[in-house]
Design a protein with these regions (language model features):
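Structured C-terminal helix/loop/strand segments within mature extracytoplasmic catalytic/sensor domains
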Residues: 2-16, 29-46, 154, 201, ...
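Beta-lactamase-like hydrolase cores
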Residues: 32-76
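Soluble periplasmic/extracytoplasmic beta-strand elements of cell-envelope proteins
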Residues: 58-62, 71, 87, 108, ...
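Active-site-proximal beta-strand/loop segments in catalytic clefts of secreted hydrolases
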Residues: 62-64, 140-143, 155, 178, ...
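Active-site SXXK
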Residues: 67, 79-107, 276
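Short, well-structured active-site flanking segments
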Residues: 94-113, 162, 213-216
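Conserved catalytic neighborhood of penicillin-recognizing serine enzymes
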Residues: 114-150, 158, 192
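Mid-domain, small-residue-enriched loop/turn segments at the edges of structured enzyme/sensor domains
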Residues: 149-211
Length: 311
């Protein structure tokens, strides 16, 4: 696999650099008079969406500069599924910045390492290795599970990822198991879970904050923009002329509540970047394939997010 991360990195740095200007204009302070009303109205819309769709919906919106928020079930825990792969790659990039790993470092693997869903690693298994950068790109853009497990092996496993989340100030998000076991989360099980509010805050730290260098942030954002799995979710509801990147997560089986997740950063043309974390548990238990009507719930969340950002 030939990675194009160096070429795309330059394109991604422009919106990241623009965050500082918005911080100066906004004074890093939300409008105390209008924010609560907007947040309450948005929370009501999200609650109404959940009632119409059935199931359980958790959402958090976060203005990356002012800190303005809106949420529904923002503090409740939800299974991350593959949404963990975006912050996982941030942990890898932190290790690169610290000299512990290199972007072009080859990571060996073989047929025995391949999981059921491994589109990129399977296509390249004959080469015997992929680079760290290629694995990050694969696990974000296609949600390649083998790539995620190989990356976890470089940082001390799930516990290593969780330690870095804590170092970045996230006391909620936790990764406990590898793919695919980490998707098996039942009610009351805190393993491999996050809350929408915690995830939105973590995204703020790694995508627009100072947790990573501008170059690393640009890589993460660019891979999110290139993601191929989220076109029917948040990005389907966000305006097409807003630059948006996301990472999906899905857990669908014959004997578990189906999970449809998506986390995103989006760039309104007249405002600072907005972080979105959306986690949806479908009322359908027995489905063994993704349902468009469940993904449409997240598309509606995207539309609500756009209106909230504009207001």
């Amino acid at each position: 696999m030939t990675s194009a991360y160096s070429r795309r990195r330059l394109l991604s740095m422009m919106p990241v650099a623009g965050v500082g200007a918005w911080a100066l204009l906004a004074g890093c302070k939300a409008d105390a008079g209008s924010a609560p009303k907007s947040a309450d109205a948005t929370a009501d819309r999200l609650a109404a969406l959940e009632k119409r769709a059935g199931g359980r919906l958790g959402v958090a919106f976060l203005d990356s500069v002012t800190g303005r928020t809106a949420s529904h079930r923002g503090g409740e825990r939800f299974a991350m599924c593959s949404t963990f792969k975006w912050p996982l790659s941030a942990v890898i990039l932190k290790a690169v910045e610290g000299g512990k790993l290199m972007l072009d470092q080859p990571v060996p693997y073989g047929v025995s390492d391949l999981l059921e869903f491994a589109p990129v690693t399977r296509a390249n298994v004959a080469t015997g290795s992929m680079t760290v950068a290629e694995l990050m790109e694969a696990t974000i853009t296609t949600s390649d599970n083998t790539a995620a497990n190989l990356l976890l092996g470089l940082i001390g496993g799930p516990a290593g990822a969780t330690r870095q989340f804590r170092a970045w100030g996230d006391a909620v998000t936790r990764l406990d198991r590898l793919e695919p076991e980490m998707n098996d989360v039942v009610a009351g099980d805190e393993r491999d879970t996050t809350s929408p509010t915690a995830m939105a805050g973590l995204l703020r730290a790694i995508l627009v904050g100072d947790a990573l260098s501008p170059t690393s942030r640009a890589l993460l954002i660019d891979w999110g923009v290139a993601t191929e799995t989220g076109y029917k979710r948040l990005r389907a509801g966000l305006p097409s002329d807003w630059r948006s990147g996301d990472k999906t997560g899905t857990g669908v089986s014959a004997d578990r509540i189906s999970k449809y997740n998506d986390i995103a950063i989006t760039y309104p043309p007249k405002g600072p970047p907005i972080l979105i974390a959306a986690y949806y548990e479908s009322p359908v238990i027995s489905s063994q394939k993704m349902r468009d009507e469940d993904q449409a719930v997240l598309a509606e969340v995207g539309r609500i997010a756009a209106e909230w950002a504009a207001g």
